[in-house]
């Protein structure tokens, strides 16, 4: 299996370019459809064995997606399944029509027009529409899709569920087939890894159909680096961070966290716990003076700077803090209504990497141009609401594209949090983390991530492995902990304290 093909995310136009290159090189269209259909049939037969799913209904649309599904229908029929084909309208593509005729010649049943209220199937195969759909599905297909969704019968979708945008993952017009499994052919379609697709996708499975790594590089050029999955093997390759035998506390990262307020006192503790798990040699905390004793008692190894606080309990200033001596600075968790000048000072004076999270993002909004003047890396970690405050003109329907645009504009790394967190580099590379758990939908989870990011950045000259490693580690630990404590049992403190046990359990 090609590593590049396993992680590259493509849109409809890129798929068309790849297929055109295959056909120009001599691959017959018929051979590609046959190969795709055979791979689909084998996967579906394995995942849905005949003992539990003897009766299969195959939904056939007007194009080549329907042709792939008809190959599946033929193969399942030939091994003894009861197969019915539902074809509201005859296929437009001649090749798909030929497969339909052949299926009928074998004695297969084909239904045109309306589907019976009780079709008598144990499994649907959705081959109505594939990639490139740009508008809501019309009748008679829309009614059929609604009927399938209401049937309660599992659906195996070909390439992507019918009705989904292959770019944004949204259900066009609000209607798509709700799949139990989606068998993506060749390269991953971008839309399958957008948050909007999660309600429709089921379990995503990728099937190889013949794209080689050389062909992908030849056709897409540098575009093959524009969007990819953050695969676990690559993300955790450098974790835990290696240390030479001669390491000392000042050589393995000095980190400053600027966090907390009277209203959000726990945030300072959580960012510090997340940072501690990342293993910086020295951890400094700049906190409102009212929080200093409490946090120092919880993290005795941290060096705490009690700082003046305003009447509202927010951090007022950083007296005596030399921002040039830190390898990384984290700012924002729980800051509350601090002054914008505080964050602007950090952006201008911090010599090391800078992570802005939570209130740090809100305070830098409208002043992002200051980030372009920084020599060291900057990482912005917004959730969708914070993203809209930072970049009000960038639509979030395409989260991958939005993160990329924001990164290019701000000259910063963007960690766009969500069910599938998107990471974009200042050069425009995009990664989507396929892992994670709704267990992380808890206040304070982001504070832990901010601290972990800062800790790894403080120890890495190259920000890429630090950012990608932290995003993967945080999400994967959440999954691991949810499996042990249930989805309701992963509060932010449990997450922070579980980071290192997870990494030890997941290690070689």
UniProtKB/Swiss-Prot annotation:
PROSITE patterns: YJEF_C_2, YJEF_C_3, YJEF_N. Bifunctional enzyme that catalyzes the epimerization of the S- and R-forms of NAD(P)HX and the dehydration of the S-form of NAD(P)HX at the expense of ADP, which is converted to AMP. This allows the repair of both epimers of NAD(P)HX, a damaged form of NAD(P)H that is a result of enzymatic or heat-dependent hydration. One of its GO terms (biological process) is nicotinamide nucleotide metabolic process. InterPro entries: Carbohydrate_kinase_pred_CS, CARKD, Nnr, Ribokinase-like, YjeF_N_dom, YjeF_N_dom_sf. It catalyses: (6S)-NADHX + ADP = AMP + phosphate + NADH + H(+); (6S)-NADPHX + ADP = AMP + phosphate + NADPH + H(+); (6R)-NADHX = (6S)-NADHX; (6R)-NADPHX = (6S)-NADPHX. Residues 232-506 form the YjeF C-terminal domain. CDD domains: YXKO-related (cd01171). The keyword Signal does not apply. Keywords: ATP-binding, Isomerase, Lyase, Metal-binding, Multifunctional enzyme, NAD, NADP, Nucleotide-binding, Potassium. Pfam families: Carb_kinase, YjeF_N. GO terms for molecular function: ADP-dependent NAD(P)H-hydrate dehydratase activity; ATP binding; metal ion binding; NAD(P)HX epimerase activity. In the N-terminal section; belongs to the NnrE/AIBP family. Residues 64-68, 130-136 are annotated as: NADPHX 1. ADP binds at residues 417-421, 437-446. Its cofactor is K(+). Residues 1-224 are annotated as: NAD(P)H-hydrate epimerase. The keyword Nucleotide-binding applies. Residues 383-389 are annotated as: NADPHX 2. K(+) binds at residues 65, 126, 162. This is Bifunctional NAD(P)H-hydrate repair enzyme Nnr. Binds 1 potassium ion per subunit. Residues 232-508 are annotated as: ADP-dependent (S)-NAD(P)H-hydrate dehydratase. NCBIfam families: yjeF_cterm, yjeF_nterm.
